[in-house]
Amino acid sequence: MFKIREKTNADHKVKYIVDVNEKNWNEAYQKKLNAAVKNVKIQGFRKGHVPYQEAIKHIDQIGLFDRAVNQLVQPIYLELVKQEKIKDSETVLEENPEVSVVEIDDKKLALSYSFETIPEVKVGDYLKINGFLSETPVKDEDVQTELVRIFKSAGKLVDKKEGATLEKGDIAFLDFSGEIDNKAFEGGKAKNYELEIGSNSFIPGFEDQMVGMKVGEKRDLNLTFPKDYHEKTYAGKPVLFKVKLNSIKEVQLPEMTVEKLNELMKTQYKNLDEAKEDIKKRMDRNQQEHANQMNTMLLTQFANEDCQFSHIPKSLLDREVNLLYQQFANQMQQIKMSVEDALKIQNQTKEQLYQRLTEQATRAIKLVLVLEEIGDLEKISVSEAEINQEIEERIKEISNNQELPKEQYDAIKNYFVTQKELIESMLTNKKVVDLIIKKNLAR
């Protein structure tokens, strides 16, 4: 079908110039020419009956070449990838090569295929990353606390008995006024403000220093605004709060029955034990998702700040940006809003959106490249059995653990088999992440 005339490797690209076999080019050209001739319209002739030599005078030659070339681009690409073993290459990306015409006329065709190279990655010390979260099992007391929180939403506020002191979990009604450098500041004063002690609604130390107060008592709280406080004017500054406790209330819980719980949660539990088991699973899942999110953020930061890359392939970047844009468009569609309207509300242009998505895509690609490099360094691999197990797990999720008819099961499995490379990559990266976290937590 073709012969490689030249192969070069420069500027992070491997470029092939191929001379297309004259017979293949002639067949493609003649096929498109004959189709074009049939569609030529000239006054005095019926469509499809214009004399051949007269018809070709009225054909757009550039458009004809373009259609004929397009017929050959994909078959030549597939054969080139196979012949040069690009699919198995550890240095060349097979996806989306740049294709251009080098030479063309009705007798010959030469094409250029330019493949991007896989970036060289210099990984930082991935065994000295601080801040990873481990998956801590949810305890029975955690479940009980969550259960109380749910019932608390239907509770009543009642006055605490006379002479009682303020404790964590109580609701305080207080007057307060704050001073920075002996001067009042905006937002630093309120009357009969409702505050749950232990909710950490105020700056660190405020609620802790109120514990033990009695109704009518006044107290000065010497505190410091956090350095990362959202109001930069106050960040890191000492502050004095003068507080007076007006009343102490506590939440009187309703009777903790399964009937009341079902009413509050809109569920159909048979008993509280079943509810606790389900709540525990949900809390475990939420905790795992939170840990995964935080750990991914740490790894992304490491990949972008402590690792070096020779380049970021445009083909990968374009694909990731398009994927992120589609996700954004789908999210807007779910709330019945167009991308254009969303951008107006955010006071953003489409160019600014693409710039943001490009930055986001770059960070994500760098993380994947780093995980792949660490996977190679640590010689991490995934077995065929692990891939098949993952496929079976995904089928179970889709079927909700129900047995599927054989025809439906086979169709779903065949789809996942076509995604084996993607599944293998996902499982490998998960192993890499687990290894990094495990080794860092063990330090």
From Swiss-Prot:
GO molecular function annotations of the record: peptidyl-prolyl cis-trans isomerase activity; protein folding chaperone; ribosome binding
Residues in PPIase FKBP-type domain copies: 169-254
GO process terms (BP): 'de novo' cotranslational protein folding; cell division; chaperone-mediated protein folding; protein transport; protein unfolding
Keyword Isomerase included in the entry's annotation: yes
Alphabetic keyword roster: Cell cycle, Cell division, Chaperone, Cytoplasm, Isomerase, Rotamase
Classification via Pfam families: FKBP_C, Trigger_C, Trigger_N
Catalysis: reaction(s): [protein]-peptidylproline (omega=180) = [protein]-peptidylproline (omega=0)
Cellular compartment(s): Cytoplasm
A single Gene Ontology CC term: cytoplasm
Cytoplasm keyword on record: yes
Enzyme class: isomerase
Enzyme Commission number, as recorded: 5.2.1.8
InterPro entries named in the record: PPIase_dom_sf, PPIase_FKBP_dom, Trig_fac, Trigger_fac_C, Trigger_fac_C_sf, Trigger_fac_ribosome-bd_bac, Trigger_fac_ribosome-bd_sf, Trigger_fact/SurA_dom_sf
HAMAP family: Trigger_factor_Tig
NCBIfam families: tig (TIGR00115)
Family assignment from sequence similarity: Belongs to the FKBP-type PPIase family. Tig subfamily.
Function: Involved in protein export. Acts as a chaperone by maintaining the newly synthesized protein in an open conformation. Functions as a peptidyl-prolyl cis-trans isomerase.
Domain comment as written in the entry: Consists of 3 domains; the N-terminus binds the ribosome, the middle domain has PPIase activity, while the C-terminus has intrinsic chaperone activity on its own.
Protein known as: Trigger factor
Organism: Mycoplasmoides gallisepticum (strain R(low / passage 15 / clone 2)) (Mycoplasma gallisepticum)
Gene behind this protein: tig
